[in-house]
């Protein structure tokens, strides 16, 4: 996993970590996916940046409901530019 590079990324990751350490244990294991939705968001922010990472994490949270089967759903890798330099 990459590390957050900007102060905004570090703040977002810190807030998610607080959720993981304080709130999540009170709720119990509920996530249908691996990695968990909170870890997915951290990975997405570190890999794609703050805005796209939050977008990807939000899309993932919308899939986390009883009608979705869940399973392994890793963060997509960044796409390479198709233009030649």
Curated annotation (Swiss-Prot):
Keyword Signal included in the entry's annotation: no
Disulfide linkage: none
Entries under InterPro entries matching the protein: Membr_insert_effic_factor_YidD (IPR002696)
Record's keyword terms, sorted: Cell inner membrane, Cell membrane, Membrane
A Pfam cross-reference name: YidD
The keyword Transferase appears for this protein: no
Compartments, as annotated in UniProt: Cell inner membrane
Membrane topology note: Peripheral membrane protein
Location (main, coarse): membrane
Top-level taxon of origin: Bacteria
One GO cellular component, as annotated: plasma membrane
Function: Could be involved in insertion of integral membrane proteins into the membrane.
Family membership: Belongs to the UPF0161 family.
Listed name of the protein: Putative membrane protein insertion efficiency factor
Organism (species): Tolumonas auensis (strain DSM 9187 / NBRC 110442 / TA 4)
């Amino acid at each position: 996993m990459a590390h957050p590079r900007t102060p905004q990324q570090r703040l977002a990751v810190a807030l998610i970590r607080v959720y993981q350490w304080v709130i999540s244990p009170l709720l119990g294991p509920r996530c249908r996916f691996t990695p968990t939705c909170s870890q997915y968001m951290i990975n997405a922010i570190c890999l794609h940046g703050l805005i796209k990472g939050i977008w990807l994490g939000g899309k993932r949270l919308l899939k986390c409901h009883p009608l979705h089967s869940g399973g392994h759903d890793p963060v997509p890798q960044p796409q390479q530019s198709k233009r030649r330099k």
